[in-house]
Amino acid sequence: MMKIVFYGANAATFEPGLSAQLDMPHEITVISDAVDGAGEAEALAGADVVVGVHYNGKGVQAARLFQLPAAGYDKVDMDALPDGCAVCNAFGHENAIAEYVMTALLSRHVPLADADTRLRRGDWHYWAGGPDGLRTELGQQSIGIVGHGHIGKAVKDRALAFGMAVHVANRSPVADSRVTAHGLDGLTDMMGQVDFVLNTLPLTDTTASLIGAAELGAMRDGAVVMNVGRGPVIDEDALFAAVKDGRLGAILDTWYVYPSAETPNPMPSKHSFHTLPNVMITPHMSGWTTGTIARRTATVAENVNRLARGEDLINVIKAPKP
């Protein structure tokens, strides 16, 4: 009997539909983030598989797999897991995030909401033939994508389809003749050449504050920085300094402060990004679609089935110690 525990509210989102995709006898338990309900600590301790997005080092004892139903793993203390426990993540969010990015980019060029609001009061500001509403086209713009993983590749393909000039900065070489490729050591140079800079990188020891004052300072006046990776990849203080006077714009979906049990609805930063008209802010929603949930649930099922059959797991972040 495979004992599977969904640890916390976020993880529980991926439980419906899992059972039908599993090939072995199993028992599924959903527990709270606080692990304070009746029998929850015992369930966590005895689980063969834990599905969760965070782990502080307490409670997991027998697990052979800690499966993240998400890409980011910066909230998981992997060293505190049992030696025989593998850690794997899941993707499947790249289509959703790419749609978010393109929607955000298009919204800066095609002001549908403002045009609708104005015309409802008889204001023809954007009418064809009028000089005030003349706008640029997305295909006249350039974008620099930081990271060439699942998200970066999905955005790249869509940006190219719109006719944008695409640059990519990545740790390893980018073999795509359609784009201008840069190493991460050339990040500052790339950021000075484009109209939009998009971060897609996860948060690791090497990516924290990768984009700081020097990199932001190299950007053109009026350029826009976007973040759908992890918030702290872009230095919080440097970013606010770069946008508060209006020189740069920003579209921010990932943050520095998140809801907690103690503060369920915090502002997303110590700085007042929310007061700036040149900054668009959203609550880490870019990848949250029914398609993402379905694809990630399928990944969880695939790894549980592989574990039961003794096969190699997919998306391994940390292999079990022998």
Label the model's feature ranges.
Residues M1-V49:
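N-terminal glycine-/charge-rich "phosphate-binding" loop or analogous flexible N-terminal tail
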